[in-house]
Curated annotation (Swiss-Prot):
PROSITE patterns: EF_HAND_1, EF_HAND_2. Ca(2+) 4 binds at residues 61, 63, 65, 67, 72. Residues 12-47, 48-80 form the EF-hand domain. Transmembrane segments: none annotated. It comes from Strongylocentrotus purpuratus (Purple sea urchin). Calmodulin mediates the control of a large number of enzymes, ion channels and other proteins by Ca(2+). Among the enzymes to be stimulated by the calmodulin-Ca(2+) complex are a number of protein kinases and phosphatases. Belongs to the calmodulin family. One of its GO terms (molecular function) is calcium ion binding. Disulfide bonds: none annotated. This is Calmodulin. Keywords: Calcium, Metal-binding, Repeat.
């Protein structure tokens, strides 16, 4: 039973992460750009400078392509 609950919890958080990624990935291309990140953060009431947004992208952008893909997003969300 504990194992089942743990599995459901994992699935739940995976689905939440997937949903969060969809919110950020406005154009649905599978990547979060700096512009998309800025847009969502602004809607959440966060006033960030371009430098702050770029820094957030750099921190999450493991492969260095300037965007955050789903795998990078998951790594960022689960690293805490």
């Amino acid at each position: 039973l504990t194992m089942m609950a743990r599995k459901m919890k994992e699935t739940d958080s995976e689905e939440e992460i997937r949903e969060a990624f969809r919110v950020f990935d406005k154009d649905g291309n599978g990547f979060i750009s700096a512009a998309e990140l800025r847009h969502v953060m602004t809607n959440l009431g966060e006033k960030l400078t371009d430098e702050e947004v770029d820094e957030m992208i750099r921190e999450a952008d493991i492969d260095g392509d300037g965007q955050v893909n789903y795998e990078e997003f998951v790594a960022m969300m689960t690293s805490k």
